[in-house]
């Protein structure tokens, strides 16, 4: 490649896809008229102007699928980043590094394979600086991570960003031209480069933190499920950790592969949990699982792979059997084996319904073959079949049921099809089975159709087993001929007789919008219309005209129905809007309605109104009139009303109201005088005639306003109110209304009668009250008096409410004991004008307890497990208030004492502890709970167990080590005291069992025995003990004891059986002296000594070889043991299945 080369690229999301660039070349992204081109040009040589930053190339070759673009690239916004899916794609591992904010930085090609050991001194310092900055930016970190960092203020060339890639025509020349453009601004440019490089190092350090994650742990492995658990990335750097700078919540992505450790991985989980359950796995399959950490769009390197294998299970459900051959009396079926799921399929089970069709299946074949022939069947007989497979783990489910028929005879000629329903473009036909056909025989039908005018003859329209079919896409009002043919696997029948059916005509088209013919009058006008362009294939029978009153009226009424195309609309109202529309009817149906025509008749002046009427009762100085609109508005809305008034004794009318309202108030009248009123209405055409006159007489006036009442408080709950008689205005006062209340604007009537005083009881002490009075006569009610305020004197406090017990969790008093104390709280009652000084608590004792101005108190010196009745009252300077309601509280019993702790079983790694009296498995509902603790390396006691059981097994201990334990009992009364410290010591472990020794014959009387050698156990030497048992002896004898791993036995006798075994002995030296810990013996090896003779003939060699083979090797012994173990396991499983489960 000698010069630039253009590479056309297509991307579905608008971003530039990754490409591979040869060494020595660099890509440039150029945009021209909205089209991006990637130009590959030779890499420009490095340019080092004085005082400027040098752009270095990466010392490593480009990674596959990675674009070595210029490093001056801002990071993409967080909302535009999307992680690449696909488990095995290389871009998934390297894309987070490519999209991080690497400005003037090198690409680290080793970051995807390292762990915490790969960091150098510079990365460690950068990580410490990152931890410091994360603390300072803890409040605004999410806002900063969601937006791209700001560009330097003195950037020489415009660079646009699109999905993390550089966009612009000048983007390709950054490496070669940036030094010249920044000439004269070296100081500012160097500062910006340092800040961006620092951000790049922080990102790398954070990626290193996310990469420090261990592989997941697989547990609860089943045939199709597994549980994966992992821990967050470790924050340990150079032996130190800072938990304050580590994020509280990570994101994780779990990748699995079933094609090997280096196979293709796929993503199965993305979230924030640290344990998941994987479902839908393949049984008996090896899987590799990895986990990858992510935080704020930065991903770490995936962990090492965890390898696990799913369990085996019963086979998958097989596919239905398929038919291989059929005759009139037999069916031959074949099938394929499904997945065996880790265990070889032993048998296939084929069931059938014997052709009865009642849903009951019977076994017809069971074996390892994959085909079977069913014989002795009847012609045209239908049978259902299903198949299952069986292996060592069980039987699979049955396959789908399939129905197969034996061969039969061709059907007879069917009857002609019958028309069930006809439409405009379709015809529904129905036919029946040929006569003499069995009901269960599978017969198909061919429906053929011929159009009268097409000239193509009959063509098939349907081929299937149904007895009905709807032929669609036909023409309206057209005749069609039909016939039906029946067939089966044996042949076709003769066609049925031809029948002819006709489709229905279509409804006609929309008529033309009607129009007005002639002049529009106030009460009538004439309309006309044209017929529709499409009559639907049939003549128009009649037209229907509908009319709706109003410009937006939707209540249509039929006003005409006939064959003519014009109509006179009469008996209309003046000035009204009318909407008219028309539709037509033919044999094909009714057409849609036409567009509506809007017509308005001319208006006239309104008609006379009814006389105005009195609204309510007449008052002394004013009356209120009300009227309705005229019966005839003249076709135009009423815009104005005019009311005239004149005294009854003289005819001098004057206008007292003109407006659009339908009521008015006439004031400045004289009480007890008669007046005449008349009314007229007007619209846009003018005023109409006056109505008839209406005579109305004014009424006498109500009493005047009362003077303010006088209030006298007789006690804290009683007050006396007095008032005077006001002016009556010509009528006597019949009664007075007194309003009383605690709020000035919300008073209620408390008295209504003729009296001039009233006594009010049931008041609250030290409370402000308001009152006013009103006089009434037969005429009406006068205005209320002015409001008067009064204050009642103070009294004893009110009753105490909300008396309740305080829970133990809310008490912070260190001297509180739930067995001898009760804590209560209450709400402060109303003091009734005098401050509350104390409270008196009555708990049933002879003397009550008085406390200060508090709302909670702890009652001490009580008896454990005792019920008390408690009530309380408040006290002030005026006396004691009433007692509150009584509550029953009970003290708790005393906490239990700790039990004695014992060690009932021990080994070099386990200690089984027991305490108290009870069964090992105690129910969780026991009232007493136990808390077992053990001392750790720092001398602190940590919790081992908390629960109701009386035993606990401590595991994963060190041999020959002393451990300290203590125990504590607790119940609903609280936690009891901690017991004394108990010290238990684990013994030393014995050596492991050795493999069976190997025996080599030296001569007729000497053989050499060798065995495996063990390493010293924690500094203790290991020796070996070799034993032999001769012939039919019942006991072994020791022939060697020492540190060697071989021994020559020289006391062999000819034609004798020898059994050898060996064990390891650990020699311990402790404070008690020398001690030997003997391990288990190895497997016994049989050896038969025989005389060695020269070969005489072929037969003799064969006999000698047979005798020599009697000594079993290690592999043969292991095979024999495995077979015996499998036999006994199957036998025990069968016994449990038969006697226990059934």
Curated annotation (Swiss-Prot):
It is found in: Golgi apparatus membrane. Residues 104-191 are annotated as: Disordered. Its main location: Golgi. GO terms for cellular component: Golgi membrane. Residues 212-313, 317-409, 413-506, 510-604, 608-701, 705-795, 805-894, 895-989, 990-1095 form the Fibronectin type-III domain. The modification N6-acetyllysine is found at residue 328. InterPro entries: E3_ligase_FN3/SPRY (IPR050617), FN3_dom (IPR003961), FN3_sf (IPR036116), Ig-like_fold (IPR013783). Residues 146-158 have a biased composition (Low complexity). The modification Phosphoserine is found at residues 147, 151, 157. Residues 107-145 have a biased composition (Basic and acidic residues). The chain crosses the membrane at residues 1121-1141. Keywords: Acetylation, Golgi apparatus, Membrane, Phosphoprotein, Repeat, Transmembrane, Transmembrane helix. It is a single-pass membrane protein. Mediates spermatid-Sertoli adhesion during spermatogenesis. Belongs to the FNDC3 family. This is Fibronectin type-III domain-containing protein 3A. The lineage of its organism: Eukaryota, Metazoa, Chordata, Craniata, Vertebrata. The gene is FNDC3A.
């Amino acid at each position: 490649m000698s010069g630039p080369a253009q590479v056309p690229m297509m991307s579905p999301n608008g971003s530039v896809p990754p490409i591979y660039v040869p060494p020595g070349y660099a890509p440039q992204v150029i945009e021209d008229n909205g089209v991006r081109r990637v130009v590959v040009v030779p890499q420009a040589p490095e340019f080092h102007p004085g005082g400027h930053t040098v752009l270095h190339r990466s010392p490593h070759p480009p990674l596959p699928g990675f674009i070595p673009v210029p490093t001056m690239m801002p990071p993409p916004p967080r909302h535009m980043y999307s992680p690449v899916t696909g488990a095995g794609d290389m871009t998934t591992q390297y894309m987070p590094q490519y999209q991080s904010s690497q400005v003037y930085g090198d690409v680290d090609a080793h970051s995807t394979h390292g762990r915490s050991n790969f960091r150098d001194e510079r990365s460690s310092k950068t990580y410490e600086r990152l931890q410091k900055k994360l603390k300072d930016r803890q409040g605004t970190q999410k806002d900063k991570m969601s937006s791209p960092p700001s560009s330097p203020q003195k950037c020489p060339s415009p660079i646009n960003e699109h999905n993390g890639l550089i966009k612009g025509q000048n983007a390709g020349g950054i490496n070669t031209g940036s030094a010249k453009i920044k000439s004269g601004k070296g100081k500012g440019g160097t500062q910006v480069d340092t800040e961006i490089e620092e951000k790049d190092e922080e990102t790398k350090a954070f990626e290193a933190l996310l990469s420090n994650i261990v592989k997941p742990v697989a547990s609860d492995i089943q045939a199709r499920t597994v549980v994966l658990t992992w821990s967050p990335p470790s924050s340990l750097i150079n032996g130190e950790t800072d938990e304050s700078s580590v994020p509280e919540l990570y994101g994780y992505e779990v990748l699995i592969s079933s094609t090997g450790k280096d196979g293709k991985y796929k993503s199965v989980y993305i979230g924030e949990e640290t344990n998941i359950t994987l479902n839908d796995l393949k049984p008996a399959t090896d899987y590799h699982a990895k986990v990858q950490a992510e935080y704020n769009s930065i991903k770490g390197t995936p962990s090492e792979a965890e390898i696990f294998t799913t369990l085996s299970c019963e086979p998958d459900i097989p596919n239905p059997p398929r038919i291989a051959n059929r005759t009139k009396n037999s069916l031959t079926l074949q099938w394929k084996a499904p997945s065996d799921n880790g265990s070889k399929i032993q048998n296939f089970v084929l069931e059938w319904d014997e052709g009865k069709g009642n849903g009951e299946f019977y076994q017809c074949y069971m074996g390892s073959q994959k085909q079977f022939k069913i014989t002795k069947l009847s012609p045209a007989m239908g049978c259902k079949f299903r198949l299952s497979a069986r292996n060592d783990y069980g039987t699979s489910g049955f396959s789908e049921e399939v129905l197969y028929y034996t061969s039969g005879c061709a059907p007879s000629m069917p009857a002609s099809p019958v028309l069930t329903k006809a439409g405009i473009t379709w015809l529904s036909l129905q036919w029946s089975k040929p006569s003499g056909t069995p009901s269960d025989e599978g017969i198909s039908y061919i429906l053929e159709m011929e159009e009268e005018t097409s000239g193509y003859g009959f063509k098939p329209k349907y081929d299937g087993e149904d007895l009905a079919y709807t032929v669609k896409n036909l023409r309206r009002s057209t005749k069609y001929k039909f016939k039906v043919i029946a067939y089966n696997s044996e042949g076709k029948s003769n066609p049925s007789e031809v029948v002819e059916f006709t489709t229905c005509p279509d409804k006609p088209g929309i008529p033309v919008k009607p129009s007005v013919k002639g002049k529009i009058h106030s009460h009538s006008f004439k309309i006309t219309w044209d017929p529709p362009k499409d009559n639907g294939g049939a003549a128009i029978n009649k037209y229907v005209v509908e009319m709706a009153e109003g410009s937006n009226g939707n209540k249509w009424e039929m006003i005409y129905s006939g064959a003519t195309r014009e109509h006179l609309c009469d008996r209309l109202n003046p000035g009204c809007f009318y909407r008219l529309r028309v539709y037509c009817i033919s044999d094909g149906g009714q057409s849609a309605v036409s567009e509506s025509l809007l017509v308005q008749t001319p208006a006239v002046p309104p008609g006379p109104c009814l006389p105005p009427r009195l609204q309510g009762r007449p008052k002394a100085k004013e009356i209120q009139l009300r009227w309705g609109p005229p019966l005839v508005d003249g076709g135009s809305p009423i815009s104005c009303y005019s009311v005239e008034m004149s005294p009854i004794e003289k005819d001098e009318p004057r206008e007292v109201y003109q407006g659009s309202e339908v009521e008015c108030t006439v004031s400045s009248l004289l009480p007890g005088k008669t007046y005449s009123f008349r009314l007229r209405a007007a619209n846009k055409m003018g005023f109409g005639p006056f109505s008839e006159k209406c005579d109305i007489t004014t009424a006498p006036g109500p009493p005047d306003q009362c003077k303010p009442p006088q209030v006298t408080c007789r006690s804290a709950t009683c007050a006396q109110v007095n008032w005077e008689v006001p002016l009556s205005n010509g009528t006597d006062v019949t009664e007075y209304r007194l309003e009383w209340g605690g709020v000035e604007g919300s008073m209620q009537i408390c008295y209504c009668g003729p009296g001039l005083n009233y006594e009010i009881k049931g008041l609250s002490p030290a409370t402000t009250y308001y009152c006013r009075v009103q006089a009434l006569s037969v005429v009406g009610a006068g205005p209320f008096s002015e409001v008067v305020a009064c204050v009642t004197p103070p009294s004893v406090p009110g009753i105490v409410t909300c008396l309740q017990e305080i829970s133990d969790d809310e008490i912070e008093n260190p001297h509180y004991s739930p067995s001898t104390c009760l804590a209560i709280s209450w709400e402060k009652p109303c003091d009734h004008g005098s401050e509350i000084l104390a409270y008196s608590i009555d708990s049933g004792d002879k003397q009550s307890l008085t406390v200060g101005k508090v709302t909670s108190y702890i009652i001490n010196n009580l008896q454990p497990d005792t019920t008390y009745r408690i009530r309380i009252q408040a006290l002030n300077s005026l006396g004691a208030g009433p007692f509150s309601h009584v509550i029953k509280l009970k003290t708790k019993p005393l906490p239990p004492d700790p039990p004695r702790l014992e060690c009932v079983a021990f080994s070099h790694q386990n200690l089984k502890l027991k305490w108290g009296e009870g069964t090992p498995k105690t129910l969780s509902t026991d009232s007493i709970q136990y808390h077992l603790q053990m001392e750790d390396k720092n001398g602190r006691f940590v919790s081992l167990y908390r629960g109701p059981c009386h035993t606990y097994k401590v595991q994963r201990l060190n041999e020959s080590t002393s451990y300290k334990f203590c125990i504590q009992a607790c119940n609903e009364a609280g936690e009891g005291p901690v017991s004394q410290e108990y010290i238990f010591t684990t013994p030393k472990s014995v050596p492991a069992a050795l493999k069976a020794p190997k025996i080599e014959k030296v001569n007729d009387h000497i053989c050499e025995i060798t065995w495996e050698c063990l390493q010293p156990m924690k500094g203790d030497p290991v020796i070996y003990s070799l034993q032999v048992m001769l012939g039919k002896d019942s006991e072994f004898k020791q022939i060697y004891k020492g540190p060697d791993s071989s021994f020559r036995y020289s006391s062999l006798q000819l034609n004798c059986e020898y059994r050898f075994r060996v064990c390891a002995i650990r020699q311990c030296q402790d404070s008690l002296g020398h001690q030997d810990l003997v391990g288990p013996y190895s497997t016994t090896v049989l050896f038969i000594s025989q005389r060695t003779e020269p070969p005489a003939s072929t037969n003799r060699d064969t006999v000698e070889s047979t005798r020599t083979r009697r000594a079993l090797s290690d592999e043969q012994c292991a095979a024999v043991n495995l077979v015996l173990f499998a036999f006994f396991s199957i036998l025990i499983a069968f016994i449990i299945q038969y006697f226990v489960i059934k």
